Amino acid sequence: VMIPFRFLHAADLHLDSRFAGLAHLPAAVRSYLRESTFAALGRLICLAIKENVDFVVISGDIYDVSDASLQGQLRFQEALKELGEQGIPVFLIHGNHDPLDGPRLVAEMPEHVTVFGGDAPGYATAHRRRDGQEVAIVSGISYPTAKVTANTAVTFSRKPGSELFHIALLHGNVDGDLQHETYSPCSRKDLIGQGFDYWALGHIHKRSILYEKPYIVYPGNIQGRSVKETGPKGCYVVDVRENGEAALQFHELDIVRWQVTELSIDGMEHEAQWVEAVERRIEDIREADPHLMTVVRFRLTGRGNVHRLLAEKGAAADLLSELQRREALRAERKEYPGLVWTEGFAVESGLAVDRSRLLQEDSFLGEMLRLAEKGEGEGSREELEDIISSAIAPLMENRELRRLLSQVSEEEKLDWLRGAAELGITLLSGLEGAGEAEGGFRDKPDGGRYDED
């Protein structure tokens, strides 16, 4: 029989994230975004106190960069101090963004904070606050340097002779998530076999529970930082019962939420219809999350004659400027809750044409559309790769472009082909251009800073 207790599991705080592309934004919007990671940390501290947790575990990447800003370090120390004043211990590890060898303030950690080293998984005992009883063994290992490519999971082991609940802190990529760098790679099988009761993971910013016996948990980051980090962000509060089973409750911590919303132009004939649909969607978002600032990217899909306006007259860029002007005024009035900042319009729509007829045509456009259709099938991926490689070969002669293009995913290349097909339809219909209206943020070909893990 175990002694019941409660702890909070968070990871990937990325304090003082720099948010690439901020220079283009109004100062009032920019400053709120820059403050968002600190605000999420503040909400984490309040949650730990309100939920009366026995301790907090943080699974790496406290700071966004190894040479963490002075502000980031001081704000984190302040947060630790606040937890200490409430008698809440903290157990933490450092990850690939904030390794132990990063140049930071040499500050003695308070007595209630345990930082695990980088040589081998260490052990610490956690106690229940109300009576001081030992309730758990916490084990963890930090990144000594930024790049840890060894499987450190297999170096973990239960503390000999202890029957307490065992928690492991690990910052790494379980089962090779291709969206993130493969630091400290391991498999679920590796983790299950080490005999721990709860794996408190960090590194992957998307929240997920990979396994339940034992629990293998990514809480995700506490504050989204790009349209690649959409939806609620926060942490888990975990209740461990007498029978050793754990119950997890997710708590939102973010103050700025990112989302991608799809808007179909099917059947739209006039610009006014499209503008009304966009404005209505923005008000729906505002109504759904009145306590948050939302950053939204619109994916314009479907087919309709309004595509002609989006492609030829730059209607998307014009509306984007107006929407951003309105929300900038709200920001200047400090009306951040309910503010909906439109980040951009990804124009993926097309003209209202008979695509099936075009696919049957013995023409250049028909051939291109058939190629785009083939690209959707797995069997033709190799052929598709050859065609795209040939098309971009001249660009590969430039060293900087070669570096950027080498990091473009297969899915992005498919998007290029789809876009080329629609552009072909557009141009052959007498139009002069189509594309994407962006508003200050951009998905850089090298992945940008937003979704770094």
Task: State where each predicted segment sits.
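Accessory, non-catalytic peripheral segments of nucleic-acid enzymes
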Residues: L253-D453
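His/Asp/Glu-rich metal-coordinating catalytic cores
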Residues: A20, P26, F55, S66-V217, ...
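N-terminal active-site segment of His-dependent metallophosphoesterases
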Residues: V1-Q73, E410
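Short coil/turn segments at beta-strand junctions that form active-site/ligand-binding loops
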Residues: I3, D54, I88, L164, ...
